[in-house]
Amino acid sequence: MVEIPVIMPKPDLMALTGGYRKTPVLQVGADIYCDTSIICKVIDDFYPEKSIYPASKEASVSAAAYWTDTFLFKASVAVAFQPKALAGSEIFSDQETAAAFMADRAELSKGSTELSMELSIAQSHWSMHMGRLELQLSQASFIGGDAPNIVDFSTYHCCWFVYIDSA
């Protein structure tokens, strides 16, 4: 495992992926896999006896993971990068780093509404979903029951993203 910075620059990642900047990335031999859902399928192919796509629930867990990776992730971005959260953040060591990050994000999302969500809406969805998950996880070890599935991994990265600075 290689640890990389949470925010750009990520020179080791960029060299490995030829410019792809998102994480996670999986390297198996000379092959590079980008995108969580693709990586999970590749790993699942290596260990089919412990699939994170249970045969009896593959459609529902795939749909839930997609919702989590898109809608909940969008809410996570809004919650994680609200001004109040950034004020005491260790990610941004100084004002210059914060300004560079914001300029990078503006360039990355230019002309797109894919990663934007109004903060009040994001907080409402985040709180509601996390409350439901907390209740469900008080009765089972994993979102899907007794064993982890793709939804657990998709949810984990959203939580990690929001709580990275509070650990």
Question: How would you describe each model-predicted region?
Answer:
Residues 72-167:
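GST-like fold's C-terminal all-alpha helical module
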Residues 1-100:
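GST-like domain detector, emphasizing the conserved glutathione-binding G-site
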